[in-house]
Amino acid sequence: MKVSPRRRARECAVQALYSWYISQNSIEQVELAFVTDQDMQGVDMPYFRKLLRGTVENVDVIDDILRPYLDRADNELDPIERTILRLAGYELKFELDVPYKVAINEAIEVAKVFGSDDSHKYVNGVLDKLAPALNRK
């Protein structure tokens, strides 16, 4: 099955955001290294950059809107789940042209690829509660 350019952008953004979170390097350094080292064919590059930069620029706001819907402390969250939730939180809050069902479904699919066995269920549960709070349902 062919993966859409936006899905590829989301998958790559999650990988780059994870690298940023773990390495504590600047997002500019992470982006440069990522696009140099990874196969970016089939990626919606403008959307990749928008997701990457937008998530980092708004990370405190995103963390604040996610926090009430988490069942554990921030430092107890799996880093990949945290990264996927941040990206989806960015899309739900700031990318209003993306239907909320699409943002949630894409996050679930990305969690199936990169998360642990039940990550997609956790991501779905959190985002399903967040969307109405952002008036996206």
UniProtKB/Swiss-Prot annotation:
Keywords associated with the record: RNA-binding, Transcription, Transcription antitermination, Transcription regulation
- A Gene Ontology BP annotation from the UniProt entry: transcription antitermination
What is one GO cellular-component annotation here? cytosol
The UniProt function text for this chain reads: Involved in transcription antitermination. Required for transcription of ribosomal RNA (rRNA) genes. Binds specifically to the boxA antiterminator sequence of the ribosomal RNA (rrn) operons.
The Swiss-Prot or TrEMBL record describes its family as follows: Belongs to the NusB family.
Write down the PANTHER family for this protein, in alphabetical order. Answer: ANTITERMINATION NUSB DOMAIN-CONTAINING PROTEIN, N UTILIZATION SUBSTANCE PROTEIN B-RELATED
Name of the protein in question? Transcription antitermination protein NusB
* Organism encoding this protein: Glaesserella parasuis serovar 5 (strain SH0165) (Haemophilus parasuis)
